[in-house]
From Swiss-Prot:
GO cellular component: cytoplasm; plasma membrane; vesicle membrane
Name this protein carries in UniProt: Tetrahydromethanopterin S-methyltransferase subunit E
Organism, scientific name: Methanosarcina barkeri (strain Fusaro / DSM 804)
Coiled coil: none
Domain of life according to the entry: Archaea
Length: 302
C-alpha cells in the first residue's frame, strides 16, 4: 500500500479512536462506573441516599472488552455468512452490543440499590428510564468507533489478528485509559465539590458525595455534562494518541521492509518525549499552585 494512503487510513483511525475515548468516558460518568463508583456505592451506607445511576457492571476494561467483542462477533458473522455490507454489519453489531450493555446496566443498578434498602436507598425508576437511553447511545458510539478502528486495521492495513480479537484488545485498552484518565475528573473533582480542592479526602468523609445539583438533586446527566468539559476530551485524546502513534511507527518504519528495529527505536523515543513532557507539566503545576495550605481553623483544631 502507498504510504500516503496508509497515513490517510491512520488519520481516520485516530479520529475514530478519539471519538471512542470521549464517548467511553462519558458513558462511565453518566452511569457511574469504575473507580469513583466505590464512593457512590458507599454513600447510602453512610446515610447519604442519592439519585446517581449506580451500575458498575465491572471494571471498565472487561466491560468494554465484552461490549466490543460482541459487536465484532456479530459483525463478522453478518459479513462472512450473510455477505452484508461492512458498514451495516458494524452498525448492527454495535446496536446489539449496546442492547446487551444496557441489560447489564439495568440489572446492575437495580440489584445494587435493592441490596441497600436497609440503608433507605430507594430505586428511582424514572432515573433508570431516563439514563438508560444515553448509556446505550454512548455505548453504541464507543463500540462502533472501536469496530471501525479494528476493521480498518484488519482489512486495509493487513493486521494479522481477526476483527473480534482486535476489538477485544482495543476494548480492554479504552476501558483502562478511561478508568485511569477520565474518571479522575469525575471522582476527584465532581463527587466531592463541597470540600476545598486539593485538600484530599478524609476517611470520615468517605461516601459524603455531592447529592444536590444547581437545581434539584444531582444525577448522572449533571456528571456527564461536567465531565464533557475536560475528562471526556482528555480521554479521547489519550486513546487517540495511543492508537495513532502505536500504528504510525510501524507504518513509517515497516517491519516487512526490514525496518523493525527503527520502529522500536521510534517508539522508545516517543515514550521518552511523553515522559519528559508530563514531568515538565507537573513541575509547572506545582510551582504555579504550590502545596495545599491549611486555613487557620484547621490549624487551631489540629
Amino acid at each position: 500500500m502507498e504510504p500516503l494512503i496508509s497515513m490517510g487510513v491512520l488519520a481516520l483511525i485516530g479520529v475514530a479512536a478519539t471519538i471512542a475515548g470521549a464517548s467511553e468516558d462519558l458513558e462511565s460518568d453518566i452511569g457511574s462506573q469504575s473507580n469513583p463508583n466505590s464512593q457512590v456505592q458507599l454513600a447510602p451506607q453512610m446515610m447519604f441516599p442519592h439519585r446517581i445511576f449506580n451500575k458498575a457492571i465491572s471494571g471498565e476494561p472487561p466491560s468494554n472488552a465484552l461490549m466490543c467483542s460482541i459487536g465484532a462477533a456479530v459483525a463478522t458473522v453478518l459479513i462472512s455468512e450473510f455477505t452484508m455490507s461492512p458498514l451495516f454489519a458494524l452498525v448492527f453489531g454495535s446496536l446489539i452490543a449496546a442492547c446487551v450493555h444496557a441489560t447489564f446496566a439495568v440489572t446492575s443498578t437495580m440489584g445494587r440499590c435493592a441490596s441497600q434498602s436497609r440503608f433507605k436507598q430507594p430505586i428511582y425508576l424514572d432515573m433508570i428510564r431516563s439514563h438508560i437511553t444515553p448509556i446505550m447511545g454512548y455505548a453504541f458510539i464507543t463500540t462502533f468507533c472501536i469496530l471501525v478502528v479494528s476493521y480498518l486495521m484488519t482489512v486495509v492495513l493487513g493486521h494479522p489478528f481477526p476483527l473480534t480479537m482486535l476489538a477485544f484488545i482495543w476494548g480492554i485498552t479504552i476501558g483502562a485509559i478511561g478508568s485511569s484518565t477520565g474518571d479522575v475528573h469525575y471522582g476527584a473533582e465532581r463527587e466531592f465539590q463541597q470540600f476545598e480542592f486539593g485538600s484530599g479526602l478524609n476517611a470520615s468523609n468517605s461516601g459524603n458525595i455531592v447529592r444536590y445539583a444547581e437545581s434539584g438533586l444531582r444525577d448522572g446527566f449533571d456528571n456527564s455534562w461536567f465531565c464533557a468539559k475536560f475528562g471526556g476530551p482528555v480521554t479521547g485524546l489519550a486513546f487517540g494518541m495511543t492508537v495513532f502513534l502505536g500504528s504510525w511507527i510501524t507504518t513509517i518504519f515497516d517491519p516487512a521492509k526490514g525496518l523493525g528495529w527503527l520502529s522500536v527505536i521510534a517508539g522508545i523515543v516517543i515514550v521518552f518525549i511523553l515522559i519528559i513532557w508530563n514531568w515538565k507539566m507537573e513541575v509547572y503545576a506545582r510551582k504555579a499552585y504550590g502545596p495545599y495550605k491549611e486555613d487557620k481553623t484547621e490549624e487551631a483544631s489540629a
